[in-house]
C-alpha cells in the first residue's frame, strides 16, 4: 500500500503534507518523500527509507518552504526499499516530480524510450 497527499494553497505546504503522511501511516510503508515548490520555483525534494518521523527529521535540517507540494509513502512492489526507489521520482532535469500508486504496466517500454532520448535513471522503479 502507499499513501499520496498533495496541497496547493496560501499556507506553508510542508506541515500539511507531513500531517497527511502521519495520518496515512496505518496503511503500512517502507519509505517516504516530499517535494515542495517555493515561490521562486525552486523545489525542495527529500526522500528517505523508513518512517515519516525520519523524513520529518531530515526536513527539519533543511529549509523547505512553499505553498504547493506532494508527498508519498511507499510499500515496495518493484525494487527494494531504498532512498533511490522512494517517491517522489523526478526527471533527470529536476523539472517533473511524480508519485504513483501501483504498477505502471508499460514501464519497460517507457524506460527504453526515455533511455534512447538520453535520460538517466536513478531508481529500479
PLM feature spans:
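Conserved short alpha-helical segments that host acidic/polar catalytic motifs at enzyme active sites
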Residues: 1-125
